[in-house]
């Protein structure tokens, strides 16, 4: 299954209605979906938040962010919650999520790429977390996966400076799984998807939550998670072989 951002004329700039739609898609995935690709049309994955959202009155059909911010911190906090779900939901879904990223992935675009489990990037990719340079912070569920990928110090440096990270550096610091020429991005992503689909589905479905648990579990807790997961898998294999 592929979810594609399709506003290339605006460099796939994002608005809140898109975030709500992303959440709906993640929540509604069919049981038989094993891999999801997050992709984008055009020369850029996403240039981030549409700056029109930061103008007085906002954009037609979208919530007025400045009006909510002026009302109270609590009003803005409540407004942001459902928007974050468009990103955080992809970290929780059962399928493996792969982002195919070309060109700009800035701010919200960077955070959408971080919502994926794996990132394949084109050699023209430019990651940047620009929120701090605008007087804000990254707030679309991107801070945890960023720190997981590159560590606290590097995450602080990237967010505080807002500098651009290219393909080779992204691979070197753990932001990207691999980098390929832009013309090979789709084919390489398809090859990765086929490799993932070639694994036994029950094992792949058990692996993702197991590794996520390892991020916060103690070693004693994690070995329990491992043996419980393995017990279920081996029991299923035995039953499939006609044993009881």
Identify the meaning behind each predicted range.
Residues 18-21, 79-82, 226:
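Hydrophobic alpha-helical membrane-association signature
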Residues 10, 40-85:
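Glycine- (often His-adjacent) and acidic-residue-rich active-site loop
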Residues 1, 29, 45, 58, ...:
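C-terminal alpha-helix plus adjacent terminal tail
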């Amino acid at each position: 299954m592929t979810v594609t951002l399709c506003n290339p004329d605006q460099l796939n700039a994002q608005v809140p209605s898109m975030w709500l739609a992303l959440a709906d898609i993640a929540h509604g995935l069919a049981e038989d979906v094993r891999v999801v690709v997050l992709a984008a049309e055009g020369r850029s994955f996403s240039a981030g938040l549409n700056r029109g959202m930061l103008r007085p009155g906002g954009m037609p059909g979208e919530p007025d962010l400045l009006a909510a911010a002026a009302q109270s911190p609590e009003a803005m906090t409540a407004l942001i919650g459902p928007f974050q779900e468009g990103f955080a939901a992809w970290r929780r879904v059962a399928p493996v999520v792969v982002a195919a990223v070309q060109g700009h992935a800035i701010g919200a675009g960077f955070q959408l790429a971080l919502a994926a489990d794996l990132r394949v990037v084109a050699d023209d990719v430019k990651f940047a977390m620009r929120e701090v340079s605008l007087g804000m912070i990254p707030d679309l569920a991107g801070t945890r996966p960023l720190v997981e990928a590159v560590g606290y110090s590097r995450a602080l440096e990237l967010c505080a400076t807002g500098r651009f990270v290219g393909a080779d550096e992204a691979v070197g610091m753990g932001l990207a799984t691999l980098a390929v020429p832009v013309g090979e991005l789709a084919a390489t992503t398809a090859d990765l998807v086929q490799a993932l689909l070639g694994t036994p589905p029950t094992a792949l479905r058990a692996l993702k939550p197991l590794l996520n648990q390892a991020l916060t579990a103690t070693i004693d807790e994690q070995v329990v998670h491992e043996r419980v997961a393995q017990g279920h898998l081996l029991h299923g294999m035995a039953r499939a072989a006609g044993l009881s």
